[in-house]
From Swiss-Prot:
Domain tr-type G span(s) in chain numbering: 8-290
Protein name: Elongation factor G
InterPro entries for the chain: EFG_II, EFG_III, EFG_III/V, EFG_IV, EFG_V, EFG_V-like, EFTu-like_2, G_TR_CS
Entry keyword annotation includes Cytoplasm: yes
Any Pfam family matching the protein: EFG_III
Molecular function as annotated in GO: GTP binding; GTPase activity; guanosine tetraphosphate binding; translation elongation factor activity
Length: 700
């Protein structure tokens, strides 16, 4: 089969935003205008096409990032037909993992902001993730029809809060109830969408006279931004010559692709205005797969390799999401970076070094699927029937193995114990949790060795609620949930030298003998977490036993002497010891090392670390006193506030242990008018009274 759409006409984009900026509605409109769905799905009647898990429709929030293919030839049919693969990403901070994961496989992003709320906490998290993966982006200021909508305020916030060089491509005509349409600053024409056909058609009109001066000012700003893309355009600009529409677009595209500027569009997805022009901007200013750098990877011989976006290179793809589908089982979403693969082909999972066979390949449209015979460079599709592929694994040609960059996933910060309600649920629960953990790398399952309980850990209360909810719905497992537990850590504050550990057992027959002397010292947080330095001189401990010493200590790190929590940020220097020709063994040295470690740890001023969250609360001004008072009771350090007439933003650092149930408390303090977001910030030493209580509770 030949390629149907040239790769230069592909756009792989993500749509991401704060939880209520109207992102799913925006995506729905994209599907409507590109002719994929004939009836617009509204989020508030639970019919949105992209939100296809039952829970999403109930809660009105997007949980799983669905990938959808759409086609667009421009509002005036001015482009050849482009293929847009849209990845809808969740906006709730408990699901940042989904956002991070989709950023990894996108080429460009549309950031949706609410014209009233502006740049909200989650927008900043998403922005940082887009920076991390150098994703070019444009902004869409949505909800221009809402009371309090202010386009230029949001443009200003993109500059001040996100550090983005925001350049408006359009200005809104009117706002709130009077929002009529937008002015295209390149064409200097007003765009008026036809309400009778839900904005499918439009007319260009003259700019309202009272807006002309403002439009000219912002157009000059736009043209200057375009001119700065090259010396040639700069010369033309300064000599007073008009830049052509083509030159302006070319200049803006160059700078947008280098992430030097963020072009800003606006509209109201709900009122069917603006999304159409934003789609044109996606094609004009966001990259095709061929516009971005080749993806880097590691060859089998550990040298660096790369793959270009071309059908002629060997096949390489990255699995970025595993979803369980009620009809076909596991769906593995993957992005093809190079080459071609047909359904039925055998490929290599280079991360696990296992062969996999592509059973069927489907192109997803929200939760409808179309079976296809092959996929090519630039495509995003889902495979059915892969056996052992996890998120972040590479699938590649058998004869050209490469491991593409791995994704890094955050450590969970909150855990709860779950127990099945009946014996019959027991087995199903293990299966369900295993399946869910495979889908979501930020969710972990383990069994507590002492209590035998099953512990699940995740990124926040909502995250775990949804996991338990999915267990009930999709796997029909009823479970009881324990109280949330905080993931504490242990570390040391002072260095101790020359601590010895000796394991000697001589009781007839072959004995056991291992003897080590170590120093223990603290490491900086954010570093490697653990280091082992071997400074044994003159063979006082034979080389073959050194790894056993390291291993003995590492096993102790899993469950620290203070309260059984993982130990972090310390180094061990092994510098002396002794051995016995007959009685020494790896096991003896492992045991000696663990004895030395425990003794040294207890002398090194051990402390308990607790996770601190970065919390941002947005509240109407009337409730600020109550909110801050409540945060102080939760041991918060309030680091600042910003206010406008509608809302006060309070930034604080709060121990996670104090944040349980906060959503409910905040609702009752502010009659449901405040919202908050939190994300893990760091670990910090717990105050003595808190640490003592935690240690005491663990002894029971």
């Amino acid at each position: 089969m030949a390629r149907t759409t040239p790769i230069s006409l592909y756009r792989n984009i993500g749509i991401s935003a704060h939880i209520d900026a109207g992102k799913t509605t925006t995506t729905e409109r994209i599907l409507f205008y590109t002719g994929v769905s004939h009836k617009i799905g509204e989020v508030h009647d639970g019919a949105a096409t992209m939100d296809w898990m039952e829970q999403e429709q109930e809660r009105g929030i997007t949980i799983t990032s669905a990938a959808t293919t759409a086609f667009w030839s421009g509002m005036s049919q001015q482009f050849p037909q482009h293929r847009i693969n849209v990845i809808d990403t969740p906006g709730h901070v408990d699901f940042t993992i989904e956002v991070e994961r989709s950023m990894r496989v996108l080429d460009g992003a549309v950031m949706v902001y609410c014209a009233v709320g502006g740049v909200q906490p989650q927008s900043e998290t998403v922005w940082r993730q887009a920076n991390k993966y150098k994703v070019p982006r444009i902004a869409f200021v949505n909800k221009m029809d809402r009371t309090g909508a202010n386009f230029l305020r949001v443009v200003e916030q993109i500059k001040t809060r996100l550090g983005g060089n925001a350049v408006p491509l359009q200005l809104p005509i009117g706002a709130e109830d009077n929002f009529k349409g937008v002015v295209d600053l390149i064409k200097m024409k007003a765009i008026n969408w036809n309400e009778a056909d839900q904005g499918m058609t439009f007319t260009y009109e003259d700019i309202p006279a009272e807006m002309l001066a403002e439009c000219e000012k912002w157009r000059a700003n736009l043209v200057e931004a375009a001119a700065e893309s090259s010396d040639e355009l700069m010369d033309k600009f300064f000599s007073g010559d008009e830049l052509t529409e083509e030159e302006i677009k070319k200049g803006l595209r160059l700078r947008a692709l280098k992430t030097e500027i963020i072009l800003v569009t606006c509209g109201s997805a709900f009122k069917n205005k603006g999304v159409q022009a934003m789609l044109d901007a996606v094609i004009d200013y966001l990259p095709a797969p061929t516009d971005i750098e080749a993806i880097k990877g590691i060859n089998p011989d550990e040298t660096e390799g790369e793959r270009h976006a071309s059908d002629d290179e060997p096949f390489a793809a990255l699995a970025f999401k595993i979803a369980t589908d009620p009809f076909v089982g596991n769906l593995t979403f993957f992005r093809v970076y190079s080459g071609v693969v047909e359904s039925g082909a055998t490929v290599l999972n280079s991360v696990k070094d296992k062969r996999e066979r592509f059973g069927r390949i489907v192109q997803m449209h929200a939760n409808k699927r179309e079976e296809i015979k092959e996929v090519r460079a630039g495509d995003i599709a889902a495979a059915i029937g892969l056996k052992d592929v996890g998120t972040g694994d590479t699938l590649c040609a058998m004869d050209a193995p490469i491991i593409l960059e791995r994704m890094e996933f955050p450590e969970p910060v909150i855990s709860v114990a779950v127990e099945p309600k009946t014996k019959a649920d027991q087995e199903k629960m293990g299966l369900a949790l295993g399946r869910l953990a495979q889908e979501d790398p930020s969710f972990r399952v383990h069994t507590d060795e002492e209590s035998g309980e099953t512990i699940i850990s995740g990124m926040g209360e909502l995250h775990l609620d949804i996991i338990v909810d999915r267990m009930r719905r999709e796997f029909k497992v009823e479970a009881n949930i324990g109280k949330p537990q905080v993931s504490y850590r242990e570390t040391i504050r002072t260095r101790v030298n020359d601590v010895e550990g000796k394991h000697a057992k001589q009781s007839g027959g072959r004995g056991q003998y291992g003897h080590v002397v170590i120093d223990l010292y603290p490491l900086e947080p954010e570093g490697p977490g653990y280091e082992f330095v071997n400074e044994i001189k003159g063979g006082v401990i034979p080389g073959e036993y050194i790894p056993a010493v390291d291993k003995g200590i590492q096993e102790q790190l899993k469950s620290g002497p203070l309260a059984g929590y993982p130990v972090v940020d310390l180094g061990v220097r092994l510098h002396f010891g002794s051995y016995h020709d007959v009685d020494s063994s790896e096991l003896a040295f492992k045991l000696a090392a663990s004895l030395a470690f425990k003794a040294a740890f207890n002398k090194a001023n051990p402390v308990l670390l607790e996770p601190i969250m970065k919390v941002e609360v947005e509240t109407p001004p009337d409730y600020v006193g109550d909110v801050i008072g409540d945060l102080s009771r939760r041991r918060a350090m309030v680091s600042g506030q910003e206010a406008n007439e509608f809302v006060v933003k309070i930034n604080a650092e709060v121990p996670l242990a104090e944040m349980f149930g906060y959503a409910t408390d905040l609702r009752s303090q502010t009659q449901g008018r405040a919202s908050y977001s939190m994300e893990p910030l760091k670990y910090a030493e717990a105050p003595k009274n808190v640490a003592d209580a935690v240690i005491e509770a663990r002894k029971k």
